[in-house]
Amino acid sequence: RHIITTAVEHHAVLHPMQKLEATGFEVTYLQPDHDGNITVEELKKALRPDTILVSVMMVNNETGAVMPIADMVKAVRRASPLALFHTDAVQGFLKVPFRAKALGADMISVSAHKIHAAKGTGALYIRPGLPLPAFLNGGGQESNYRSGTENMPGICGFGAACADTDAKADIARMAQLRDLAREKLAQIDGLVLIGSQAAPHIVNLSLPCLRSQGIINCLQSDGIYAVSYTHLTLP
C-alpha cells in the first residue's frame, strides 16, 4: 500500500496523505529541484510494484513550475500499471493548455474560484470506465459518487465562467505580463527571482534583508497587490 506525492502539494493533498500514513499506508514525498520542478526520473525511482496511487500537482502555486504530467502518467503505466494517477490542476486549469484524454490521468481536480467563479465549487474529472466507490452515500447525485443536493448556482456560475473565457488569448496576455515583470524586476539590485516560473500567471521573488510587509504596503499604495506568504504552506 504505497502512495507517491510531492513535498510541494497543496495542503488539500498533503494533509490527507498524512492521515493515510497514520492508518498504515506508506507515502513517498518527491522533492523538487532548485527550480521547483519534479522530474519524471525522480518519479521513476520511487515507483514500486505495490504503488497504488500517484498524486502530483500540475502547476505549483508558488514557484510557477509546470510538472510533466503526461510523461509522468506514462511512466506510472509502465512501472506500476495498477496505480491510479491524480493531478491537482487547480493552478493549471485554463492557465496551461491540456486535454484530459491526452494527459491520461485517472483523476483531475479543478476549482471554480481560480477562474473568477464562486468559491466552494469545483470539478473532478474521472477517467471514463474507472470504477470508484461512492465518496458520500445518499441520494445518488453526481453519478452516485457524491450524494447531496448540488450547489446549482455555483455550478452554473462555474460553467458560465468557463464559457466566457478565451483561454488562448488570456494565456498569451498573462505570459506577456509575466515576462515584462521578470525583465523589469531583474534590473533591481539584490532582488532574486525564484523558480522556473514556467506558468504564465505566477512570478515569485525575494528581496533579502527587507521586511516583506513594508514592500507590500509600498506596492499597494501604487495599486499593485502581492502576497508575502501563502496560507497553503502554513502549518
Whereabouts are the PLM-identified features?
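Conserved PLP-dependent catalytic core of the aminotransferase class-I/II
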Residues: 166-218
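Active-site PLP attachment segment
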Residues: 94, 101-160
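Conserved small/polar residues in nucleotide/adenosyl-binding loops
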Residues: 230-235
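Active-site phosphate-binding strand-loop segment of PLP-dependent enzymes
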Residues: 32-93
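Alpha-helical structural signal in soluble globular domains
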Residues: 16-20, 46, 68-79, 99, ...
